């Protein structure tokens, strides 16, 4: 038996740390000891009963999709050795499969029958041990240590930039400026990757002080508060990381001609006001602007995310992990504190 954080999906206030059976070898030949699991808004929604699906025939789901672990037994995985740090790819292709899943593009699944660790029909990583198929285990640079837990959220950014570049190259395209809306983990990682691409980076968030503006400025980027329309320039690219309806609407109006607005998530930010459908059409049609949604991630995005983290300053990355909690305090980890950026549940030392 082992300890795991589980929840009865669809029912709030049912999350608990409990004893569960050791992972079944049928779940994968690679046995991993958990080091840390990142907490994000999706986990909170699942615990609140708003999202999530348990494995078939079960009522409870093991939480956690932002993983980091150490290989205990590599099994048949030729590229892994005992002691390697790894993270687990989250999404699995649908069983049909659809045309995209059939060629490894499961992030672009067309029929919605994909599954996801810790979210949809497969147990997650918030347990003392977990198993995984070798092809879904991503080796982590040991120099990252516990910061390897940032790999999964970085895949969100890697996929988003891939989409932005693909759209931009439909015509002559030399982007100079990018606005990132939201300075949470995804937004800060988006700013990091934009800086690595040599762009003039601006980040907008509602807080005026604390670790978020400090981290933005430490990157060499510009920090803004207030409305999107008051930043003083028209960005070539906006990476939207809040999911707030009004910010999305304002971003459509604020982006420069030929610009690209990439939406990286959904939220409960209410309805936008003051923007009619005709205004959206005018902004997009007359100025050749594009709005694209992006959900992570297939295998190449995990590799790209690893490359981005390997290039990043370790001390800056460390600033993203603002709180570490033990598994016994998972409930505290799920409750947001004012200066939180990335909270992790730590099972062991990296």
State where each predicted segment sits.
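C-terminal hydrophobic helical "lid"/dimerization subdomain
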Residues: 2, 249, 299-350
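Mid-domain Rossmann-like dinucleotide-binding core that forms the NAD(H)/NADP(H) cofactor-binding site
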Residues: 83, 144-228
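C-terminal substrate-binding/catalytic core of Rossmann-like NAD(P)-dependent dehydrogenases/reductases
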Residues: 271-321
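Glycine-rich cofactor phosphate-binding loops and adjacent beta1-alpha1 units
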Residues: 167-174, 217-289
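Residue-level marker of beta-strand positions
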Residues: 66, 84-85, 100, 129, ...
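Glycine-rich beta-strand-centered segment in the early N-terminal region that forms part
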Residues: 23-37, 52-99, 141-143
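NAD(P)H dinucleotide-binding glycine-rich loop of Rossmann-like/cofactor-binding domains
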Residues: 95-178
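Residues in the short beta-alpha loop(s) of Rossmann-like NAD(P)-binding domains
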Residues: 205-209, 267, 297
């Amino acid at each position: 038996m082992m300890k795991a954080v589980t929840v009865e999906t669809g029912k709030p206030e049912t999350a608990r740390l409990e004893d569960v059976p050791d992972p079944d070898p049928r779940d994968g030949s690679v046995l991993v000891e958990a080091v840390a699991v990142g907490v994000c808004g999706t986990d909170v929604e699942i615990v609140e009963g708003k999202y999530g699906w348990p494995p078939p025939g079960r009522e409870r789901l093991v939480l956690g999709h932002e993983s980091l672990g150490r290989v205990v037994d590599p099994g048949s995985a030729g590229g892994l050795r005992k002691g390697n740090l790894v993270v687990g790819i989250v999404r699995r292709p649908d069983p049909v499969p659809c045309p995209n899943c059939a060629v490894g593009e499961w992030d672009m699944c067309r029929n919605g029958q994909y599954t996801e660790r810790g979210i949809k029909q497969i147990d997650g990583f918030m347990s003392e041990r977990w198993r995984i198929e070798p092809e879904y285990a991503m080796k982590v640079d040991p120099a990252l240590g516990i910061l390897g837990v940032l790999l999964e959220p970085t895949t969100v950014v890697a996929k988003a930039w891939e989409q932005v570049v693909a759209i931009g190259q439909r015509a002559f395209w030399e982007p100079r400026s990018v606005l990132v809306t939201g300075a949470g983990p995804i937004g800060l990682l988006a700013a990091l990757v934009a800086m690595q691409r040599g762009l003039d980076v601006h980040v907008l968030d509602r807080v005026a002080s604390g670790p978020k503006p400090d981290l933005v400025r430490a990157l060499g980027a510009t920090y803004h508060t207030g409305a999107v329309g008051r930043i003083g320039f028209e960005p070539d690219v906006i990476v939207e990381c809040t999911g707030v309806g009004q910010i999305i609407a304002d971003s459509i109006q604020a982006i420069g001609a030929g610009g690209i607005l990439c939406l990286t998530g959904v939220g409960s930010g209410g309805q936008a006001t003051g923007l009619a459908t005709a205004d959206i059409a005018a902004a997009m049609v007359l100025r050749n602007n594009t709005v694209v949604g992006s959900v992570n991630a297939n295998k190449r995005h995990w590799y790209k995310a690893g490359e981005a983290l390997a290039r990043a300053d370790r001390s800056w990355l460390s600033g993203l992990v603002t709180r570490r909690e033990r598994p016994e305090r998972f409930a505290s980890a799920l409750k947001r504190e004012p200066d939180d950026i990335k909270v992790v549940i730590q099972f062991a030392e990296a």
